Amino acid sequence: KSKDWKVKPELLHGDGFQDAIVLIFGKPRTAIFAHMDNIGYAVSYKKNLVRIGGPRGESGWKLVGSDSKGEIECTLKVQWLWAAGNKKEELKYRFKRNIDRGTPLIFKPNFRETEKTVQTPYLDNRLGVWNALQVAENLENGIIVFSTYEEVGGGSVQFLAKYMSSLHIAQFG
């Protein structure tokens, strides 16, 4: 809960920030980066899916997302086809309607918690964000960056690091 944070940060986001979020606390001397994107699939033509990142999935696994028509919870369908003696993987989705092309679909979270462990697919991204938010509670002088596009497009970290460098020199140097 941000209302319990020791210092209220300046929030940078929106146009020009490549869907990233930057929190600036006090006079920054350090930075934490956590990426927010997930691996999964993008919807293509004829219910086909294209990989985003390096997901491994099996038929029957649940995928979630949203498009212009609403929320989506669909099922992954993995088929192996033989063409000219070569085995080829075909990825499709099962859903009651067509999903807008380009819509990202990620694995439905499946958190399993015991007294000693938490398990869910692709936990690294989620833990990075959670850890950064825990640090935010007591951070007085630093920057927390929630970056994007690490799974596709080369990521936003290089752009954000350059921006932070110019910001640091301009405001805090």
Where do the PLM segments sit?
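N-terminal hydrophobic/helix-forming segments and targeting peptides
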Residues: 1-173
